[in-house]
Amino acid sequence: MVQISEVKGNGRDNRITTHSHIKGLGLKEDGTCESVGGGFIGQEKAREACGIITDLIKSKKFGGKGVLFAGGAGTGKTALALAIAQELGPKVPFCPMVGSEVYSSEIKKTEALMENFRRAIGLRVKETKEVYEGEVTEMVPEEAENPLGGYGKTISHVLLGLKTHKGTKQLKLDPSIYESLQREQVSTGDVIYIEANTGAVKRVGRSDAYATEFDLEAEEYVPMPKGEVHKRKEIVQDVTLHDLDIANARPQGGQDIMSMMGQLMKPKKTEITDKLRGEINKVVNKYIEQGIAELIPGVLFIDEVHMLDIECFTYLNQALESTISPIVIFASNRGICTIRGTEDIQAPHGIPTDLLDRLLIVRTLPYSESEIRSILQIRAKVENIILTDECLDKLAQEGSRTSLRYVIQLLTPVSIIASLHGNKEIGVQDIEECNDLFLDARRSAQVVKSSSGFLQ
């Protein structure tokens, strides 16, 4: 009997994360929203407010402004920020960070903030390039007497024939391009393109007219290019200002032994100077004026903003008012608390009032029991877990008593317990067993209180 077996692909399954079920804000065309949409349950006012913010970002009328998501733990502040990122699409830069990220022994706090600011500002560069593209029909190097004397001869120029469906052209190329042709191992029958401005050569592949040839080396066969040999191509590149900073702060190169040793050693984080950033800003502004580039203000999301200190907040006041600035979204789950870095100055959300005045504040509300039930239903579907109505009710009650995060974290352990019992569906007894194994924050605190005499 012939044995046939299926080969499993080696591609990894997408990891299920806390916000895997969030697909967007779930708004209608008129900007209003229903209670269920885009993976969200409830928070209608907050989602509608985020919809308006998204429209302002898309129309580029919201640069250098700030938004604060204020609400209790587990009310969907991070989910709203991720939904805004998904609504904006992959072309708009979105840079998430946590307030405690700025504290480092290598670079200053303000430098870490500015790095993330620059990561959240995109630059779309449009460049029109003249290229010669086609199948190589001939490649003849022309030799001449060596101008430096001696017996050897040098290559004065190269005659290159290129063919497309529309016609053929013979080009007379510089000897430096011949070196590039040799480096790319170009031969007759290859499809190549040459940039007219830089002389860069790129071998696309072998022409499909030669596909019947027997070759030991695996070749990529490509069709003969359409259109003329000489054509203009518009190339669009998306970069962030931080990419430009890094490229200029750490230029690669140097063939001496010290340069090579420096590359082998563990690189220390480079602090980019304000002078360098100023020079890059000048070049960027020049490109924007010439119409070569377009500035795309993205979104910087700072979670747990109360972890920043008074120095960072003072710096943020200045950074928000600069000409090149992204949209900054803050999130905090604190009420009235002491501003970090001060001894007795208290402020709402741990943010100084002068910065709070500059922000639009969006409030997120705690979830009701029915909303927790609906969220659990969506999460169970994402994680491929089958829950009965009784189990959903039980978990929703548990969620309103403890927290939404706790019951979401229970879903996977409960499904494992049910499978150990040989059940496909999760039962109430599985939830109770899981409850006994894993404590929530309140029960854990009670245990610590009752055993304070034993635990030191």
Swiss-Prot record:
Record's catalysed reaction(s): ATP + H2O = ADP + phosphate + H(+)
Gene3D superfamilies according to UniProt: 1.10.8.60, P-loop containing nucleotide triphosphate hydrolases, RuvB-like helicase, domain II
Pfam families given in the database record: TIP49 (PF06068), TIP49_C (PF17856)
Leader sequence segment: none
Main location: nucleus
Transmembrane segments: none
Record-level Gene Ontology MF annotations: ATP binding; ATP hydrolysis activity; ATP-dependent chromatin remodeler activity; DNA helicase activity
GO biological process: box C/D snoRNP assembly; chromatin remodeling; DNA repair; regulation of transcription by RNA polymerase II
Protein origin, superkingdom: Eukaryota
EC number: 3.6.4.12
Residues the entry annotates as binding ATP: 71-78
InterPro entries: AAA+_ATPase (IPR003593), P-loop_NTPase (IPR027417), RuvB-like (IPR027238), RuvB-like_C (IPR041048), RuvBL1/2_DNA/RNA_bd_dom (IPR042487), TIP49_P-loop (IPR010339)
Role according to the record: DNA helicase which participates in several chromatin remodeling complexes, including the SWR1 and the INO80 complexes. The SWR1 complex mediates the ATP-dependent exchange of histone H2A for the H2A variant HZT1 leading to transcriptional regulation of selected genes by chromatin remodeling. The INO80 complex remodels chromatin by shifting nucleosomes and is involved in DNA repair. Also involved in pre-rRNA processing.
Protein name: RuvB-like helicase 1
Source species of the chain: Schizosaccharomyces pombe (strain 972 / ATCC 24843)
Organism lineage string: Eukaryota, Fungi, Dikarya, Ascomycota, Taphrinomycotina
Gene symbol of the encoding locus: rvb1
